[in-house]
């Protein structure tokens, strides 16, 4: 285990002002190699160069980005937008549907987003699975939800919706409310069809059968299995205890979170973000409200930044404690999970006193937080957390992490390299366990994290043991950050003085009718955000979580793209676990620390 404070100094915090990033190094490299006339550079509030190019150029450009001296080694996100109803598209290429690709270069600490316009009559693109293996699930999701075909894809099938589903839900002409559908009817013929679809056929999953003398055993692990940690199914192809092949099956927890973003106001969507990763609490609010604040041009007061950081770190500790208890339980020890739940209850006491709720406070607001900190909050933080948890962590390390059985079950198990992690889009503790110091709070500071003194724990072996030890040390660093928040909490307002702060400060509404009207409109109809695009990533509990928002100058988002870490982490499972035992798979699943709501959205 190593602790490091080193992080690149070349990163400038993205401001809300629009920019086309024409001066970005990667833009110059693309212009020089391919010619500037082949690209359109879009001005956005994402903080990332956004470059439009023709479909025919896509594979060449992606290959070029991978071979640069400081290459773009991670396909961070891939999704699409139905542009057919969008009004504000001045200066952009004609497009009915737009597919966007978000790449990250670790060496540069820089991103680039490529956009490819498509006509409704020809929704085809070449697959990127030959360049990035994690493009597989992202392309399946785009086909499933928007109906765009990726030629050459090895297994282009539904991933979120059931096999028998009709239509593509993220299209603008697809209903967003249950009342817009015909009444649901299940006759005998349809029931028979659904039962037929549930039959397991190995060939449909890309699994080989045996020969006339022997065959493999096929085992369903889930979708209701305690070690699956949620509604998650793994189909295993076994040769005895050895896993020859493995196919994850997701979508059982899909709730249409991105579609909901198109019919909720910017303000009323905040509670939905709480439930994307239901252990993260206000941590889930943070990337969303930061992205909206970029759209609005809101700079929050220093007190708001520090309050948000403190609350986010409280939920990080909560999540890591649940991971620790259940992980040790998966390996075979029962006692620690009861201790970690006792610790979590103490933290919930703090959270409830501050926000009024426990797991899903929905407490952050556009331009601030719901209300100021209550009297006596420092005593709660000190007594329930800072004076209690450090000693408990030492007990966990002695009782569990140094236990010979746990070490024997986890050291060297389900290990992968930094290069493999980047290829699959792995972030968070799963990436840092391989030895790479990449923490967004340090590399790309947001909400004032650059003002805090903390270290980034990294591992060295990238195995199940390192993933646990990294998270334990992250709890210690979070405790340090919370203590700094408590001792250095700035004075000042808990909301920004800005017309789009939602809801506006209540006391102002009692002084003049104009402010009262503004308050009424923003709470009922919602604030109107400028037509623009914004993006914000944060270091969430499970890895990097981000929101990419498109505003068309309305009270609601035109497109809400939620990139979650757990989706990428589950896609990596087959590449890591093939050739291992089933017992090792249980350890691996526990070490990932995923939540199915985070996967399925």
Swiss-Prot record:
This is NADH-quinone oxidoreductase subunit C/D. Residues 1-191 are annotated as: NADH dehydrogenase I subunit C. The keyword rRNA-binding does not apply. GO terms for cellular component: NADH dehydrogenase complex; plasma membrane. In the N-terminal section; belongs to the complex I 30 kDa subunit family. In the C-terminal section; belongs to the complex I 49 kDa subunit family. HAMAP family: NDH1_NuoCD_1, NDH1_NuoD. Disulfide bonds: none annotated. It holds the Pfam family Complex1_49kDa. It is a peripheral membrane protein. It is found in: Cell inner membrane. The keyword RNA-binding does not apply. It catalyses: a quinone + NADH + 5 H(+)(in) = a quinol + NAD(+) + 4 H(+)(out). It is an enzyme of class 7 (translocase). Its main location: membrane. Keywords: Cell inner membrane, Cell membrane, Membrane, Multifunctional enzyme, NAD, Quinone, Translocase, Transport, Ubiquinone. NDH-1 is composed of 13 different subunits. Subunits NuoB, CD, E, F, and G constitute the peripheral sector of the complex. PROSITE patterns: COMPLEX1_49K. GO terms for molecular function: NAD binding; NADH dehydrogenase (ubiquinone) activity; NADH:ubiquinone reductase (non-electrogenic) activity; quinone binding. Its EC number is 7.1.1.-. Coiled coil: none annotated. NDH-1 shuttles electrons from NADH, via FMN and iron-sulfur (Fe-S) centers, to quinones in the respiratory chain. The immediate electron acceptor for the enzyme in this species is believed to be ubiquinone. Couples the redox reaction to proton translocation (for every two electrons transferred, four hydrogen ions are translocated across the cytoplasmic membrane), and thus conserves the redox energy in a proton gradient.
């Amino acid at each position: 285990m190593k602790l490091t404070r080193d992080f690149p100094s070349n990163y400038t915090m993205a401001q809300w002002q629009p920019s086309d990033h024409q001066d970005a190094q990667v833009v110059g490299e693309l212009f020089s190699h391919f010619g500037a006339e082949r690209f359109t550079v879009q001005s956005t509030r994402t903080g990332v160069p956004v470059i439009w190019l023709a479909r025919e150029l896509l594979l060449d450009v992606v290959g070029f980005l991978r071979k640069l001296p400081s290459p773009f080694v991670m396909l961070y996100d891939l999704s699409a937008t139905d542009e057919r109803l969008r009004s504000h598209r001045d200066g952009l290429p004609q497009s009915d549907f737009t597919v966007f690709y978000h790449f990250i270069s670790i060496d540069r600490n820089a991103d680039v987003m490529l956009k490819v316009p498509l006509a409704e009559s020809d929704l085809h693109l070449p697959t990127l699975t030959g360049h990035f293996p994690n493009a597989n699930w992202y392309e399946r999701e785009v086909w499933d939800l928007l109906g765009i075909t990726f030629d050459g894809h090895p297994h282009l099938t539904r991933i979120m919706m059931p096999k028998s589903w009709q239509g593509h839900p993220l299209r603008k002409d697809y209903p967003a409310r249950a009342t817009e559908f015909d009444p649901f009817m299940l006759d005998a013929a349809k029931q028979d069809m659904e039962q037929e679809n549930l039959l397991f056929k190995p060939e449909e999953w890309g699994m080989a059968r045996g020969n006339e003398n022997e065959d493999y055993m096929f085992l369903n692990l889930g979708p209701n299995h305690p070690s699956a940690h949620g509604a998650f199914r793994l189909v295993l192809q076994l040769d005895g205890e050895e896993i020859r092949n493995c196919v994850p099956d997701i979508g059982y927890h899909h709730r249409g979170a991105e579609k909901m973003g198109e019919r909720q106001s910017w303000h009323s969507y905040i509670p939905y973000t709480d439930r994307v990763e239901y252990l993260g609490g206000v941590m889930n609010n943070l990337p969303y409200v930061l992205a909206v604040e970029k759209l609005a041009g809101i700079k929050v007061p220093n007190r708001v930044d520090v309050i948000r950081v403190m609350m986010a770190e409280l939920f990080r500790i909560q999540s890591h404690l649940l991971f620790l208890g259940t992980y040790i339980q998966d390996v075979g020890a029962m006692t620690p999970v009861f201790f970690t739940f006792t610790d979590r209850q103490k933290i919930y006491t703090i959270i409830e006193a501050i926000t009024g709720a426990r797991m899903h406070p929905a407490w952050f607001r556009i331009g601030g937080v719901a209300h100021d900190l209550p009297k006596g909050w420092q005593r709660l933080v000190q007594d329930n957390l800072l004076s209690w948890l450090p000693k408990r962590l030492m007990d966990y390390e002695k009782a569990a992490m140094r236990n010979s059985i746990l070490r024997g079950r986890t050291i060297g198990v389900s290990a992968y390299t930094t290069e493999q992690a980047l290829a699959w889009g792995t972030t968070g503790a799963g990436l840092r366990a391989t030895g790479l110091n990449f923490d967004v709070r340090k590399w790309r500071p947001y909400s004032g994290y650059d003002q805090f003194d903390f270290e980034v724990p990294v591992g060295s072996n990238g195995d199940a043991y390192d993933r646990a030890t990294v998270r334990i040390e992250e709890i210690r660093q979070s405790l340090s950050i919370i203590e700094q928040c408590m001792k250095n909490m700035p004075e000042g307002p808990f909301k920004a003085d800005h017309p789009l702060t939602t809801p506006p400060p209540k006391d102002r509404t009692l002084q003049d009718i104009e402010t009262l009207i503004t308050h009424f409109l923003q709470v009922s109809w919602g604030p109107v955000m400028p037509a623009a695009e914004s993006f914000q990533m944060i270091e969430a509990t499970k890895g990097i979580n981000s929101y990419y928002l498109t505003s068309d100058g309305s009270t609601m988002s035109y497109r809400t793209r939620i990139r979650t870490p757990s989706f990428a982490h589950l896609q990596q499972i087959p590449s890591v676990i093939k050739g291992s035992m089933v017992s090792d798979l249980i350890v691996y699943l526990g070490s990932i620390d995923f939540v199915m709501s985070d996967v399925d959205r």
